[in-house]
UniProtKB/Swiss-Prot annotation:
Optimum pH is 6.0. One of its GO terms (cellular component) is nucleoplasm. It is found in: Cytoplasm; Nucleus; Mitochondrion inner membrane. It comes from Homo sapiens. Residues 19-160 form the Tyrosine-protein phosphatase domain. Can dephosphorylate single and diphosphorylated synthetic MAPK peptides, with preference for the phosphotyrosine and diphosphorylated forms over phosphothreonine. In vitro, dephosphorylates p-nitrophenyl phosphate (pNPP). The active site is at C104 (phosphocysteine intermediate). Its EC number is 3.1.3.16, 3.1.3.48. The gene is DUSP18. Activated by manganese ions, inhibited by iodoacetic acid. This is Dual specificity protein phosphatase 18.
């Protein structure tokens, strides 16, 4: 696995689950509560907040731009419609020396999926490497199965091959990277 070229060296990166989790020098993920914390936003020099939810309302602060991506955390939601536009926007903010906070309600599924799409597109990371890296920065990420299917399709579009596959399990279709975990939880 190769780290994103603009990521902090591992020794400076601290995994976070409650506050803002730094993924690259210009991209962070959080939950809705942290996204409305003025001190967290200002101390991390956030210039753009992308709200990937229908249920979280942002408190608007001066000097921060806001974007809404109204997608429910449902396997049937078409988050893939936003993969390219949001990845492009995150990249555009970075090119202007800005910092983006990507958040949903919990900072687990929707924002994580869009982060993975961005890392694949702009850091040429495989889906597997993007997931491994993002999980090392924010251990609680877990996109829903529908988002995984969309990410797998996107990876194939970008690179012509897949590093993650959906497999059948006692709890339904899951990405193969969760297979061992599910088997430990549900003995066959």
């Amino acid at each position: 696995m190769t780290a994103p070229s603009c990521a902090f060296p591992v020794q400076f990166r601290q995994p976070s689950v409650s506050g803002l989790s730094q993924i690259t020098k210009s991209l962070y993920i959080s939950n809705g509560v942290a996204a409305n914390n003025k001190l967290m936003l200002s101390s991390n020099q956030i210039t753009m907040v992308i709200n990937v939810s229908v249920e979280v309302v942002n408190t608007l602060y001066e000097d921060i731009q806001y974007m809404q991506v109204p997608v429910a955390d449902s396997p049937n939601s078409r988050l893939c419609d936003f993969f390219d536009p949001i990845a492009d926007h995150i990249h555009s903010v970075e090119m202007k020396q800005g910092r983006t906070l990507l958040h949903c309600a919990a900072g687990v599924s929707r924002s994580a999926a869009l982060c993975l799409a961005y890392l694949m597109k702009y850091h040429a990371m495989s889906l597997l490497d993007a997931h491994t890296w993002t999980k090392s920065c924010r251990p609680i990420i877990r996109p829903n199965s529908g988002f995984w299917e969309q990410l797998i399709h996107y990876e194939f579009q970008l690179f012509g091959k897949n590093t993650v596959h959906m497999v059948s399990s006692p709890v339904g279709m899951i990405p193969d990277i969760y297979e061992k975990e599910v088997r430990l939880m549900i003995p066959l």
